[in-house]
Amino acid sequence: TLPPVTGGATLKSALHDIIDGHSAVSYTPGVWNALVVLDEDATNTANVLLIYGGDSRAKSLQDNGTNSANYWNREHLWPVSRGMNSDTGTLGGRDLHHIFASDKDVNARRANLPFDEVSGGSTDPEAPLSRYTSSAYEPRDADKGRIARA
């Protein structure tokens, strides 16, 4: 907990003491290992819950580079191509605050589209409450808060 402080250098020092000693995870396997814990389905601990669709998917169906359907992968809410350092070995590229388990096909459709309200557009087949156009992606309402806080 944060002790009572008046601000300035004292506050900065107190915050530093709280976060000092954190551990950075590797992109592979670190982020994968974290997602199976962070996005675990509380009703079926062998599965992860996927962002955008809310589906529960077996942890064992982690994308291994195949073209198989039903696999899940790592969705970066802030796309690497939109200003994140493209080196996933950097801290930004593996920041667990904005990486979630996602259906690999949904992730591919979202690509690097910005989040926005979408009227019309297409319904995502694997995430039917999410919609997209060629210029924007609107996640289902149940995920908007998570995304906003990421």
Could you say what each language-model-derived stretch is?
Residues 64-150:
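Domain-level detector of nuclease and nuclease-like folds
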Residues 1-57:
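N-terminal module-boundary/linker segments of secreted carbohydrate-active enzymes
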